[in-house]
Amino acid sequence: MTDPEVFCFITKILCAHGGRMTLEELLGEISLPEAQLYELLKAAGPDRFVLLETGDQAGITRSVVATTRARVCRRKYCQRPCDSLHLCKLNLLGRCHYAQSQRNLCKYSHDVLSEQNFQVLKNHELSGLNQEELAVLLVQSDPFFMPEICKSYKGEGRKQICGQPQPCERLHICEHFTRGNCSYLNCLRSHNLMDRKVLAIMREHGLSSDVVQNIQDICNNKHTRRNPPSMRAPHPHRRGGAHRDRSKSRDRFHHNSLEVLSTVSPLGSGPPSPDVTGCKDPLEDVSADVTQKFKYLGTQDRAQLSSVSSKAAGVRGPSQMRASQEFLEDGDPDGLFSRNRSDSSTSRTSAAGFPLVAAQRNEAGAMKMGMPSGHHVEVKGKNEDIDRVPFLNSYIDGVTMEEATVSGILGKRATDNGLEEMILSSNHQKSVAKTQDPQTAGRITDSGQDTAFLHSKYEENPAWPGTSTHNGPNGFSQIMDETPNVSKSSPTGFGIKSAVTGGKEAVYSGVQSLRSHVLAMPGETTTPVQGSNRLPPSPLSSSTSHRVAASGSPGKSSTHASVSPASEPSRMMMMMSDPAEYSLCYIVNPVSPRMDDHGLKEICLDHLYRGCQQVNCNKNHFHLPYRWQLFILPTWMDFQDMEYIERAYCDPQIEIIVIEKHRINFKKMTCDSYPIRRLSTPSFVEKTLNSVFTTKWLWYWRNELNEYTQYGHESPSHTSSEINSAYLESFFHSCPRGVLQFHAGSQNYELSFQGMIQTNIASKTQRHVVRRPVFVSSKDVEQKRRGPDHQPVMPQADALTLFSSPQRNASTVSSNEYEFIELNNQDEEYAKISEQFKASMKQFKIVTIKRIWNQKLWDTFERKKQKMKNKTEMFLFHAVGRIHMDYICKNNFEWILHGNREIRYGKGLCWRRENCDSSHAHGFLEMPLASLGRTASLDSSGLQRK
C-alpha cells in the first residue's frame, strides 16, 4: 500500500478504538515493525497523528491520537467553492430530529458520502472511513462539534468573568486555543478543557471525558507547535513580558501546563539557589533531543536516550539544578511528542528513567473543591418521602482519610536512595520566614540541609506536621500519616476517608505563598516533630522512611513535645474555604481530570461469587453488583449507603434526588457540581453465561404525561411495541451509536441510542428514552450467593465442550462446597474417561469414576472460556495425594501448593495426556481433572510420574 492508503488505514483503526490507542495496541493491529511505523507516523505529521508520551515507574507509555484538518462547513447554504464537508453534524452524531425519510426537511445534508464530500475526504486521505469512524475523527478535531463558547468571556481572575447572567451555560475557554491560533504567551483565558465546569457542559452535549481529553491533547499539540520554547521569553514590553510573573489564568489549577523543577544534587549539599525566577531552563539546551525519544522505538540501543537526560542533568551546576524552572501553558520542548499534560495520574519521566516533577498551577477557586457536607442525607423520591441516610462512605477505595496526602507549597528533590522528597523554593522559604516566628513553623527535616515549611491556616495556631514522602503504588509521591493502627474515623466524626489513587503530588511555586490546611482532633495540641524521629511505617506505605504528622486546631495551644509511636494518630483533613458550611474534606493534590481512568469500571463477577483467584485482576472488587462514587479531587469516594441511591436510580421517574442540601442529578451524573459515577457488573447480554450477578437493564420511553413505560409493555393509551428491553439492550451493545427502527401498532419509530431519543417518523414527535437497571439489594446478593433457591442455568454444550454439566441435587450443595457425582458405567462420559485411561494402563481396573461438581468453579471456567480466542480444551490427568483432595475440590488447583518441578501442560503442575504407566509403591490415588471438575478413583498398586 502507498503511504496515503496506510495513513487512512491507521486512522481507521484509531477511530474504531475511540480515536486514541497506545503504541503497543496499534502495533498489535498493524503488521509493521516499530521502526517503520515510526517513520510513517513522522511522515504523516502532527496534523494527522498526535504522538504523546506519559511515564511512570513502570516506564514510558506512548499513545497515538488521530486528528485531521478536514472541517465541516458552518454555512447553512454554501454557494461558493468550499473545501469543507457539507453535512449535518447532528445527523452524524445520531441526534438529528429529522428522520431518514424526512432528511430533505433538514437545512443540512444527511448524505455524508455525497460526491462532493467524498472528494473532500479523498483530498484529506480519509475516503476509507465509514460514518461512525468519521464522526469520531471530526468530533475531536473540528471545534464546530464543541458546545458554544461564551463570546463575553473575559478571562480568569477578574471580578466579572463574563457579561452573561450567572451561571453561564457556555464554555469559558479560549476560542483561539481550540482553533490552534492562540499566540498569547500568557493568555488570560483558560486553556483547560478538562476543568470540571467545562467538562460538565461537554458531557451535556454528549462528549465524554475521554473525547474531551483527546481534544485537549490535540489543542495542546497545536499550541506547542505555534509557541515553541524558543519563543517563550517574551519581550518586556509585550503582553506577558518579564514584568508579569504569569497571567491569572495560569495561576489556576491548569492540567495542561508544566513547571519543571530540576532535581538537586544527589548529595543534597548546599542551599537552593536564591534566584528562582531568574534561572534558565536546564532542559532548554536539549529541547530538540526530546524528539529523539521515539526515534529509537523498537531498538535495543538506549544509550542516546539516556544521553538526553544526562545532558539535562549535567549541563548546569548544582545551584542552578535546584532552581524552579518553568514552561508556559502546554509547554514542552519542540519535538515529535507532546507530553500529555492533562493526564497527571502518572509522573513524567525521561527516557532514561529520571523523574520530571510536574508542578501544576493552581487556581484559588478551583483549589477549593470540597466534599458536600453533612453526615446524614435526605432521600426525596417522587412521593416526597424523606429518609435520612448516611451520605458518604467511610472509606475510599480501601484507603483511610488519615492516610490522605497533604501537599502544600512543597517541591521535590532526589535523595541518595532514589526516593523523591519534598523541598521548597528558597523564595518561598524566605517569604514564610518573614511572616512566621521560626518556633511556630512546622518543619520537615531529613539527612540533607534542605528544610520544608508548612504554614497553618490559622496564624495564631500554626500546624506542626512532621511528614515525609514516598513513592506510591501508581508512581506518585505523597506525604502520608505514618502512625500505625490508624483510626477508622475522621476527626470530626463524619466517617470520611480519603486517599490519592493516582497522580503526581502537586508542586506549587510562585510569588504568592499557598497554605496547607490541617485540622486536628478537638482537644488535641499541636506538637512539632523533628524529622530525625522516625516511626514505624504505616502498613499502607510503600516506603520505609516515614514520619508521623500532628496537626493543630484553632483555639488550642501548641506544645513542643515529641510524638512517639504510641501517641494518638494524627488525623489530617483538608478544610474548605468556609468551614462552617462545609465540614467535610477536600484534598489539594491535583490528579488527572480523566476521571474515567481512575479505578476500574467493571465489577468482577468472580469476586461476587467469592471466587476471584486472579492476583492482578483488572476488574473492580466490590460486594455489590453496583458501586456509586463521588469525585472529589483527587479521588473517587464511595457513598456510604448505596442502596438508597441505587433504588432511586432504578426508578425511571426519578431524575433528581435531594440529599439534605445536595442535589444528585442522574441525567447529568453530578452531585451539585461534582461528578458522580456508577460502576456495574457487565450487562446480562454481554455474556452467553447466564450469571446471576450480571446487570439486567430495562428500557423506558416517556409519554405525553411524563410517565415512563417499559418497552414491550402495554399502557392504557398506547399499543405495545414489537421490541422489548432485552432486544434493545442487545442492539445497544452491538451498535451503541446506531439508530433502530421499529413499529408499535400502525406507528413507525426511530430510536437513537446516542441521543436516547425516540422519534415518530410520521409526526416527528420525540420522546425521551432512559435505560435503568433492575434494583438488587444486598440481601438479594447474599441470597444469590448462598443458593439453593437460585441456581444459574448452565449453557448448552458446544463443539468445544468435552462434557455437559451433570444433573445433581442442588439442595445438597452449598455455594461454597462441592459434591461428588458417581458416573454410571453406561454413560458416554464414563466410556471416554475409561478409554483414555486404559490406553496406557490396561493392567489396572477402574473401580469408580466420580465427577466433582462445584458451581463456583464451573461458572469461573465458563466465563474465562468465553473470553478465549483459541478455545482448545484438553482432557488431562494429574496425580495428587489425598491430603490435597478437599482443597482442590473446593478451590481448584494451586500450582504453588500442589505443583512440582515438571512443567509440561500447566504452570508448575504435571499434566499428562496419557495416564501413568508404571508402579513402585502401593496406595490409593486420586486424579482430579481441573478444567472439568472430575475425579478418577483408582484401586491400584501405585503410579509413577514420568
UniProtKB/Swiss-Prot annotation:
Basic and acidic residues composition-biased segments: 242-257
Modification after translation, per record: Phosphorylation at Ser-273 is essential for sequential phosphorylation of Ser-269, Ser-265, Ser-262 and Ser-257 by GSK3-beta. Phosphorylation by GSK3-beta enhances its antiviral activity.
GO molecular-function terms, A-Z: DEAD/H-box RNA helicase binding; NAD+ poly-ADP-ribosyltransferase activity; RNA binding; zinc ion binding
GO cellular component, one term: nucleus
Start and end residues of each stretch annotated as Disordered: 221-283, 302-354, 461-491, 523-570
Zinc finger region(s), C3H1-type: 73-86, 87-113, 150-172, 173-194
Motif segment (Nuclear localization signal): 69-76, 412-413
Residue(s) carrying Phosphoserine: 257, 262, 265, 269, 273, 324, 350, 425, 553, 583, 680
Keyword Disulfide bond belongs to the record: no
Region of interest (Binding to EXOSC5), ranges: 224-254
InterPro entries in the record: ARTD-AVP, Poly(ADP-ribose)pol_cat_dom, WH-like_DNA-bd_sf, WWE_dom, WWE_dom_sf, ZAP_HTH, Znf-CCCH_8, Znf_CCCH
Chain positions found as Phosphothreonine: 277
Residues annotated as domain WWE: 684-771
Localization (cell): Cytoplasm; Nucleus
GO annotation, biological process: cellular response to exogenous dsRNA; defense response to virus; innate immune response; negative regulation of viral genome replication; positive regulation of canonical NF-kappaB signal transduction; positive regulation of mRNA catabolic process; positive regulation of RIG-I signaling pathway; positive regulation of type I interferon production
Residues covered by the PARP catalytic domain: 805-946
Region annotation N-terminal domain: where it falls in the sequence: 1-254
Subunit structure: Homodimer or homooligomer. Homooligomerization is essential for its antiviral activity. Interacts with EXOSC5. Interacts (via N-terminal domain) with DDX17 in an RNA-independent manner. Interacts with EXOSC3, EXOSC7, DCP2 and DCP1A. Interacts with PARN in an RNA-independent manner. Interacts with XRN1 in an RNA-dependent manner. Interacts (via N-terminal domain) with DHX30 (via N-terminus) in an RNA-independent manner. Isoform 2 interacts (via zinc-fingers) with RIGI in an RNA-dependent manner.
Record text about domains: The N-terminal domain is sufficient to bind to viral RNAs and promote their degradation. The second and fourth zinc fingers are involved in binding to specific viral RNAs. Contains a divergent PARP homology ADP-ribosyltransferase domain which lacks the structural requirements for NAD[+] binding. It is therefore inactive.
Its biological purpose: Antiviral protein which inhibits the replication of viruses by recruiting the cellular RNA degradation machineries to degrade the viral mRNAs. Binds to a ZAP-responsive element (ZRE) present in the target viral mRNA, recruits cellular poly(A)-specific ribonuclease PARN to remove the poly(A) tail, and the 3'-5' exoribonuclease complex exosome to degrade the RNA body from the 3'-end. It also recruits the decapping complex DCP1-DCP2 through RNA helicase p72 (DDX17) to remove the cap structure of the viral mRNA to initiate its degradation from the 5'-end.
UniProt-recorded name of the protein: Zinc finger CCCH-type antiviral protein 1
The organism of origin for this protein: Mus musculus
